[in-house]
């Protein structure tokens, strides 16, 4: 059983991105293991929502690159959450083709995945891309506040 908590996963993803940005840091393998455990557990939307808010703290392009790297470590059949987040970020960055690719991957894995279906509607209706930025800025502090020592997967 996993002993990764929401707050431990938050700290791990923050450290991973900071290490990715730093020219002198070495990314620790236990950091990626914690993150992959958290992402793999699709039953914990709290951590997924934290991932969606990362561009409040880090540049969007950096977050996209880091999550794309991490997605390669997530087991097949467990990638719908990270693909959905990557779809949102690609769409925000104006890369509609990549956004649709990630969205298709998420929906192919789980046609009923709520975030992927929400994004499908958002993309189809032509929402302003800035809408997600505004929502993220408003919601991310609340998401962080709700992160706790709940074991992911329990």
Language-model features: locations:
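Charged, compositionally biased boundary regions
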Residues: 1-154
């Amino acid at each position: 059983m996993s002993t990764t908590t929401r707050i431990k996963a938050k700290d791990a993803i923050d450290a991973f991105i900071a290490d990715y940005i730093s020219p002198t840091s070495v990314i620790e393998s236990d950091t990626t293991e914690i993150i992959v455990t958290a992402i793999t557990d699709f039953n914990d939307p709290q951590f997924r929502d934290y991932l969606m808010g990362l561009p409040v703290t880090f540049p969007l392009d950096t977050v996209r690159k880091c999550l794309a790297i991490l997605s390669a470590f997530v087991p097949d059949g467990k990638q719908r959450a990270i693909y959905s987040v990557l779809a949102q970020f690609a769409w925000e960055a104006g890369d509609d083709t990549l956004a649709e690719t990630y969205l298709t991957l998420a929906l192919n894995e789980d046609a009923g995945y709520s975030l992927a279906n929400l994004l499908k509607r958002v993309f189809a209706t032509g929402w302003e891309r800035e809408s997600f930025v505004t929502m993220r800025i408003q919601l991310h502090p609340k998401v962080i506040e709700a992160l706790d020592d709940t074991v992911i997967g329990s």
